[in-house]
């Protein structure tokens, strides 16, 4: 077990066995927004500072019927989220991946746990053949995680996003089965 120190200075023993994965719900919007606004989460994603609960809720309401969105919850606190967003028509075999892990839980295998469940669902329940993602080139822990699950580098998008006052590159990665 690892000790987790939360922003409110509460120490707790963390065990991955206590993380419950479940479908994301609209009433998760506030907790998800809180996580999305954390500096580490924001640094690794395309999220803007000060995202509102309303924006999160609207995004959740606009999910397609074949999209998969899950959260990881530990002792009632959302510590991760991940989703696969299915394309349509001739690309219906493709889904785009998003994943975030709460700053206090980064490096504790939560990302591995939630991504494994999501990929199992994609492979065994939705017949998704190709999963794509973009990841900032300096996000080495995320790149290693994706490689562990068979994602391969397909290219680099130069000056893909503006972050902390400068443009940053992103890799395009995909997993085929």
Where are the predicted features?
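Acyl-donor-binding surface of acyltransferase catalytic domains
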Residues: 1-15
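Conserved GNAT acetyl-CoA-binding A-motif
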Residues: 122-134
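A short beta-loop-alpha structural element at the N-terminal edge
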Residues: 19-32
